[in-house]
Curated annotation (Swiss-Prot):
<dbReference type="InterPro" id="IPR010243">
    <property type="entry name" value="RNA_pol_bsu_bac"/>
</dbReference>
<dbReference type="Pfam" id="PF00562">
    <property type="entry name" value="RNA_pol_Rpb2_6"/>
</dbReference>
<dbReference type="Pfam" id="PF04561">
    <property type="entry name" value="RNA_pol_Rpb2_2"/>
</dbReference>
<dbReference type="InterPro" id="IPR042107">
    <property type="entry name" value="DNA-dir_RNA_pol_bsu_ext_1_sf"/>
</dbReference>
<dbReference type="InterPro" id="IPR015712">
    <property type="entry name" value="DNA-dir_RNA_pol_su2"/>
</dbReference>
<dbReference type="InterPro" id="IPR007120">
    <property type="entry name" value="DNA-dir_RNAP_su2_dom"/>
</dbReference>
<comment type="similarity">
    <text>Belongs to the RNA polymerase beta chain family.</text>
</comment>
<dbReference type="GO" id="GO:0003677">
    <property type="term" value="F:DNA binding"/>
</dbReference>
<comment type="subunit">
    <text>The RNAP catalytic core consists of 2 alpha, 1 beta, 1 beta' and 1 omega subunit. When a sigma factor is associated with the core the holoenzyme is formed, which can initiate transcription.</text>
</comment>
<dbReference type="GO" id="GO:0032549">
    <property type="term" value="F:ribonucleoside binding"/>
</dbReference>
<dbReference type="GO" id="GO:0003899">
    <property type="term" value="F:DNA-directed RNA polymerase activity"/>
</dbReference>
<keyword id="KW-0548">Nucleotidyltransferase</keyword>
<dbReference type="GO" id="GO:0000428">
    <property type="term" value="C:DNA-directed RNA polymerase complex"/>
</dbReference>
<dbReference type="InterPro" id="IPR007641">
    <property type="entry name" value="RNA_pol_Rpb2_7"/>
</dbReference>
<protein>
    <recommendedName>
        <fullName>DNA-directed RNA polymerase subunit beta</fullName>
        <ecNumber>2.7.7.6</ecNumber>
    </recommendedName>
</protein>
<dbReference type="InterPro" id="IPR019462">
    <property type="entry name" value="DNA-dir_RNA_pol_bsu_external_1"/>
</dbReference>
<dbReference type="InterPro" id="IPR037033">
    <property type="entry name" value="DNA-dir_RNAP_su2_hyb_sf"/>
</dbReference>
Length: 1370
């Protein structure tokens, strides 16, 4: 493979034994595809498919008036260009959205004649109507809602369709399995069928009161006869004068115990009474030609009649269907001359009489009576009129407006009831209901299997697009009602469509969904990995999903169908465990919303390169081998038996039977888990913590690539959108810290477009978690780029790879108890070198409002503040950028009018003399919070339309315009240079008819002449050839056009910046100040590795006291070795060994460079590193210069990749260690034979430790749980209103709770005075508190405890119960 520009700088040595068959897909594909399909903005209106917005409009329109003579039709919709781009929306606090305009027709009909009912079109009015704003997705797959970045999480919900299950014997004490079925539509009423312990079958609608299922069957038009015919086969009898004859059916007799002697037609006894009928008996009966068997009278009694029996003479019904035979009934039948009789066939084993028994409990007589019963159940208390009854029943399951199975539901339904085809009506039919009841009865009879609701074939994913569409539909449905009401008026009044449609309900529905839905979440932006994971999250919670409290263990557990679809490792700890999952690396969604995963096709034991994506249901049909199955050179499976999966179970099968094979060993895990090296050696619980904590790593000042990675780092960084990648290839024309200008290759430049790409980099931008988003260029001027190359690194990336921590030299050893219980000991050098220093950006906002007493003002003129306190504010009262501020410093001066107070005579006099004084305003300035300090890095001022801008606001606008003009000038410069190059090529050597500097007619134009003429005068040259003249003219026109378009763009930008800002109601001016806070590593900060090995920094030790090696190098971090064995995360030990090898190899390369070794020598050593084991790298693509520059990048350590489940073996680590540390070097460093341990020396005494210590490099992270954010202290502060006790929590500046158990402790010590103080003056004794304050001021230290306020609250509580309680003071 060819190396990209960025990869050439540093190649990661991979130990993967298998080449990738399938590249890791774009990780945000699911989100972006779903929303693109919802909007269909780049599809011509006529070509749009019926999904997303198009489907929502189609479902709501046409709207017809009540009398049917006015109709509103939908034609098409268009999306307007958003008014502000993403960055502008973020700074102004707006929503990045596009206006939807729908073209609708208002059609008014007329009657053809006064008598006829047929209609003719009277007039048609067409108009574009505003239909609310739809938020747009950014390039990174997120949304900007009110200025904050949010993510819509996909939802995993139960797929529509029909499901069969049983209660696992939990309902009834006998442990009997009660079967049930449920038809779940996408929209509409749920229909449940369930057996009760007496084996009667009931149904219920929307979990209401249950009713016998026969009522529903009658309501869909079945008679008792047809119900029985549908569920039972019949036994045919012939009535004799005494007894009867039964038709002989061998299958029904076999296995039964004879209740009487069974004889053949000759009268010979074949089966004696009380004997079991066997296959031999039935064969004998068949051979004797027996068609009927004589049965005694009592055999008939209790049998159930299958059809109505009618008296042939009178037409009277003697016996109704489902009636049991009795002696008197048989007598009646004989006397009426009835000979043939049909009874339903039932038995105890596999043909229960459930439907027959249910039918007997039901008293309704016909279809209408059944529907009335259903109406009464749905609408108790309402009178059942015929129209209302029929309308309700139609609306329940047969009306497309109220019931929608959806395409998925119909597909699942048909598959379940065994119908061919995946399509059909979206409402239920009578056959559907009957089919479900039949399957349920079969289940009770022991045929078939129940569904597993946790199977991913029964759970589907609802994506952003679908969720947004549902909201838009809701909004349209609300509009539909309002429009229907008003359509009648359109006949009389000349109304246009926009008079009828009010878009507010749509905007409200979308606003509520994007702003407040449980699935619309504040984006986790701590680092790039957190962003990507958040967008790939799949949640079972949310509207229409599960709730935490109701979700049982089964739903949360890992299911076999999660393989390759949902990660078995990454899920939160705590109440949401298993309910929130992460999509696996290669997983994608199919058209129905089910998760699919890719497999390679295997034919006759040979693995092909064909790849099929299988859903969970399809996968169950095949035998699938694992990705690590051994193959020979031709790609055939080796060995007689291959480890494979069949129907979810792991088995060994012969190679010929294998039909598919996994595409990659990492296929089963998510992005975060696939970034953990040696994941296969970690316990799953610790791997879960490791994956979760990687997302909490804070971006540090100088990101450093992980020495030991997995090879997914680059994909994750690029797909997260944190790094800047080249959209087109070209040459870097200009680079500075804020922008990169690329001149695009001619081949990739589009004709008529500017061949320049300008990448403006993000500088010190605040993320949602207050971390710092910052991009740094990694290209130089003149570099050649290809499309997709990384041109700038972002937060937590290093040369285009994710880098969330630092490589630290780790020693596993105890050190004076400072690493007890997972504490971490840190070398002071780490802090001094700022290895874990991070920048956090805080946004502080102040608003000047219009109050009743007058407008607040942002000003420098603040009462009672000294000049020193104001010295950093400019004349507008806003702090300068670059000022370093401490707690309590004024950032923005603001004064608020005070209420009128009664003035003393003296004040009145002063006022009369000096006019209005500052006493009528109070200082409400924005100050730095307690406990935070930092540097002001940016200020933004927003002013309401119509209010004079202050100087500072104007200055900010001017700076922004200057920056924008610079961009345009750069583009113009490159375009002009390109144009003049083309002109030079065009004119050189041509004949001219004349031109500047008295160019003679017929003279040849040469380079010397062109160099002597001002470039802009080249257009005045008159070439002799017409074609050349035309080309020159077209170049001139295109240049002028480009200039004109740039001027327009600048004008538009200026207009945007100078127009007033949209601010909340009553706000005149808003100032945002951004503070950058540097956080150094300190005791109390939480740190972790990638294997779930977390801990808290306990002490920062001077370099000279740390344990050191024989060559004097000291450990960066000392960890407790007891943290490894019990937690079973051995991956960290292997990572340490391999990291140690990487560092050693880097040092060897550094030594070679220092000794100025030849490039060929360095190349040979690199060949040994990269190509002696593991995956081979083609270093011949790099020339000598590139090899040396790559060697320079490798001096800090050679990066390794050990892919998940396909990583470096122990032997490979050993080989690398021996290559990195030859004998002489190992001795110099005091390493053991294995090179994995070293003898260390105590920094304080210089003595050698007795035993060798495991030492090496691990990628260690600083997590976003910083002691500075958690540390909090209070002396006095706010108190709760009712109880007068101090509030709790840092946010409320609260106190520490001295709870019940702490009181017990003081009681146990007998510390009476301390206890009294705790419960009174330090808590809620209001009088006592003030007295203590007074005594402290006076220098006395006496305490007078009074009555705690909470006692008074208790007394009041008791009184409210009507008990008169009083405190008697003695």
């Amino acid at each position: 493979m060819a190396y990209s520009y960025t990869e050439r700088k540093r190649i990661r040595k991979s130990f993967g034994s298998r080449d990738s068959v399938l590249e890791v897909p774009y990780l945000l594909q699911m989100q972006k595809d779903a929303y693109t399909a919802f909007l269909q903005s780049d599809v011509a209106p006529k070509k749009r498919t019926i999904e997303g917005l198009q489907a929502a409009f189609n479902s709501a329109f046409p709207i017809v008036s009540h009398n049917g003579f006015v109709e509103m039709k939908f034609v098409e919709y268009n999306l307007a260009k958003p008014a502000f781009d993403v960055r502008e929306c973020q700074t102004r606090g707006l929503t990045f959205a596009s206006a939807v305009r729908a073209k609708v027709q208002l059609i008014i009909y007329d009657r053809e004649s006064s008598t006829s009912q047929s209609k003719v079109v009277k007039e048609v009015k067409e108009q574009e109507v505003y239909m609310g704003e739809v938020p747009l997705m950014t390039e990174k797959g997120s949304f900007i809602i009110n200025g904050t970045e949010r993510v819509i999480v996909s939802q995993l919900h139960r797929s529509p369709g029909v499901f069969f299950e049983h209660d696992k014997g939990k309902t009834h004490s006998s442990g009997k399995l009660l079967f049930s079925a449920r038809i779940i539509p996408y929209r509409g009423s749920w229909l449940d069928f369930e057996f009760d312990p007496k084996d009667l079958l009931f149904f219920r609608v929307d979990r209401r009161r249950k009713m016998p299922v026969s009522i529903l069957l009658k309501a869909i038009g079945l008679t008792p006869e047809s119900i029985l015919a549908n569920f039972f086969v019949n036994d045919n009898f012939r009535l004799m004068d005494s007894g009867a004859q039964m038709e002989f059916v061998s299958e029904r007799l076999r296995g039964e115990v004879a209740r009487f002697d069974i004889t053949d037609k000759s009268g010979k006894v074949v089966v004696a009474k009380d004997k079991r009928v066997t296959a031999r008996h039935t064969r004998e009966l068949e051979q004797s030609g027996t068609k009927f068997i004589s049965v005694p009278e009592d055999f008939l009694i209790g049998r159930v009649v299958a059809k109505n029996i009618v008296d042939p003479d009178t037409g009277e019904i003697i016996a109704k269907a489902n009636e049991e035979l009795t002696e008197s009934l048989l007598k009646k039948l004989r006397s009426a001359g009835i000979q043939d009789l049909q009874c339903i066939y039932t038995n105890e084993l596999d043909q229960g009489a459930y439907i027959s028994q249910t039918l007997r409990t039901d008293e309704t007589v016909d279809e209408f009576a059944a529907r009335v019963a259903i109406y009464r159940m749905m609408r108790p208390g309402e009178p059942p009129t015929e129209d209302a009854v029929q309308a309700l029943f139609q609306r329940l399951f047969y009306n497309p407006d109220t019931y929608d199975l959806s395409r998925v539901g119909r597909m699942k339904f048909n598959a379940k009831v065994g119908r061919d085809g995946a399509t059909g009506p979206m409402v239920l039919s009578n056959e559907d209901i009957l089919a479900v009841v039949k399957i349920l009865v079969d289940l009770r009879n022991g045929k078939g299997e129940v569904d597993d609701i946790d199977h991913l074939g029964n759970r589907r994913v609802r994506c952003v697009g679908e969720l947004a569409e549902n909201q838009y539909r809701t909004g349209l449905a609300r509009i539909e009602k309002a429009v229907k009401e008003r359509l009648g008026q359109a006949e009389q009044e000349p109304l246009m469509p926009h008079d009828l449609i009010n878009s507010k309900p749509i905007s409200a529905a979308l606003k509520e969904f994007f702003g407040a839905s449980q699935l619309s979440q504040f984006m986790d932006q701590t680092n790039p990995l957190a962003e990507i994971t958040h967008k790939r999250r799949v949640s079972a919670l949310g509207p229409g999903g599960l709730t935490r409290e109701r979700a049982g263990f089964e739903v949360r557990d890992v299911h076999v169908t999660h393989y390759g679809r949902v990660c078995p490792i990454e899920t939160p700890e705590g109440p949401n465990i298993g309910l929130i999952n992460s999509l696996a690396l290669y997983a994608r969604l199919n058209e129905y919303g089910f998760i699919e995963t890719p497999y390679r096709r295997v034919a006759d034991g040979k693995v092909t390169m064909e790849i099929d994506y299988l859903s969970a249901i399809e996968e169950g049909k095949y035998i699938i081998a694992q990705a690590n199955a051994e193959l020979d050179a031709e790609g055939r499976l080796i060995g007689d038996l291959v480890s494979a999966r069949e129907k979810g179970d792991s088995t060994l099968v012969s190679a010929e039977r294998v039909q598919y094979m996994d595409v990659s060993p990492a296929q089963i895990v998510s992005v975060a888990a696939s970034l953990i090296p040696f994941l296969e050696h970690d316990d799953a619980n610790r791997a879960l913590m490791g994956a979760n904590m990687s997302r909490q790593a804070v971006p540090v000042l100088r990101p450093e690539k992980p020495m030991v990675g997995t090879g997914i780092e680059r994909v994750a960084a690029v797909d997260s959108g944190t790094v800047v990648t080249a959209t087109r290839g070209g040459i870097v024309d200009y680079v500075d810290a804020t922008r990169i200008v690329v001149r695009v290759n001619d081949a990739e430049a589009v004709a008529g477009e500017v061949g320049v790409d300008i990448y403006n980099l993000i500088k010190y931008q605040r993320s949602n978690q207050n971390t710092n988003i910052h991009q740094r260029p990694i290209v130089k001027r003149g570099d050649k780029l290809a499309k997709g190359d990384v041109v700038a690194d972002g937060a937590s990336t290093d040369l285009g790879e994710i880098a969330i921590g630092q490589n630290m030299l780790i020693a596993f050893m105890p050190w004076n108890g400072y690493n007890f219980e997972d504490s971490i000991l840190i070398n002071e050098r780490v802090v001094a070198e700022d290895r874990y220093t991070s920048i956090h950006i805080e946004e502080l906002v102040v608003m000047a409002r219009d109050t009743k007493l007058g407008a607040e003002e942002i000003t420098r003129d603040i009462p009672n503040l000294s000049e020193q306190q104001l010295n950093r504010l400019d004349e507008s009262g806003i702090i300068y950028v670059g000022a370093e501020v401490q707690p309590g410093d004024v950032l923005v001066g603001k004064v608020t009018p005070k209420g009128e107070t009664t003035l003393t005579p003296e004040e009145k006099l002063l006022r009369a003399i000096f006019g209005e004084k500052a006493s009528d305003v109070k200082d409400t300035s924005l100050r730095v919070d307690q406990g935070s300090q930092g540097t002001v890095i940016d200020v933004q001022v927003f002013t309401r339309e119509g209010i004079q801008r202050d100087k500072r606001a104007q200055q900010i606008i001017d700076d922004e315009l200057k920056r924008y003009r610079l961009d345009l000038n750069d583009q113009l410069r490159i375009v002009e240079a390109d144009a003049f190059d083309r002109i030079e090529k065009l004119l050189n050597g041509r004949v001219a008819n004349g031109g500047p500097q008295k160019l003679a007619k017929g003279a040849k134009i040469d380079k010397a002449y062109l160099d002597g003429v001002e470039k802009f005068h080249w257009f005045d040259i008159r070439p002799a050839e017409d074609e050349v003249a035309t080309q020159l003219e077209s170049i001139k026109n295109s240049l002028e056009q480009t200039r004109h378009s740039f001027d327009l763009a600048f004008e538009e930008k200026r207009k945007k910046l100078t127009q007033g800002d949209e601010l909340p109601a009553g706000v005149l001016k808003m100032v945002k100040v951004y503070l950058a806070v540097k956080r150094r590593l300190q005791p109390g900060d939480k740190m972790a590795g990638r294997h779930g090995n977390k801990g808290v920094v306990s002490k920062i030790v001077p370099v000279e006291d740390m344990p050191y090696m024989a060559d004097g190098s000291t450990a960066d971090i000392v960890l407790n070795p007891l943290g490894v064995p019990s937690r079973m995360n051995i991956g960290q030990v292997l990572e340490v060994h391999l990291g140690w090898a990487g560092k050693g190899l880097g040092q060897r390369i550094g030594d070679m460079l220092q000794q100025e070794a030849r490039a060929a020598e360095i190349r040979t050593f690199m060949e040994e590193i990269y190509n002696s084991r593991g995956r081979k790298e083609d270093l011949t693509q790099l020339d000598d210069k590139e090899i040396v520059s790559m060697a320079q990048a490798l001096t800090t350590g050679v990066p390794f990749a050990t892919p998940v489940f396909d990583g470096a073996s122990e032997q490979e680590i050993q080989d690398m260690l021996h290559l990195a540390y030859p004998e002489e070097l190992a001795q110099r460093k005091g390493l053991t034979e294995s090179r994995t341990q070293a003898y260390l020396y105590d920094g304080r005494t210089g003595d050698r430790f007795e035993r060798p210590t495991t030492i090496g490099y691990m990628h260690y992270l600083k997590l976003h749980h910083l002691v500075d954010d958690k540390m909090h202290a209070r002396s006095t502060g706010p108190y709760s209103l009712v109880t007068q006790q101090p509030l709790g929590g840092k946010a409320q500046f609260g106190g520490q709770r001295f709870g019940e158990m702490e009181v017990w402790a003081l009681e146990a010590y007998g510390a009476a005075y301390v206890l009294q103080e705790m419960l009174t003056v330090k808590s809620d004794d209001v009088v006592g508190r003030t007295k203590v304050y007074e005594s402290i001021v006076k220098g006395e230290h006496a305490i007078e405890a009074g009555m705690p306020e909470s006692f008074n609250v208790l007394v009041k509580e008791i009184r409210s119960l009507g008990l008169d309680i009083e405190l008697e003071r003695s």
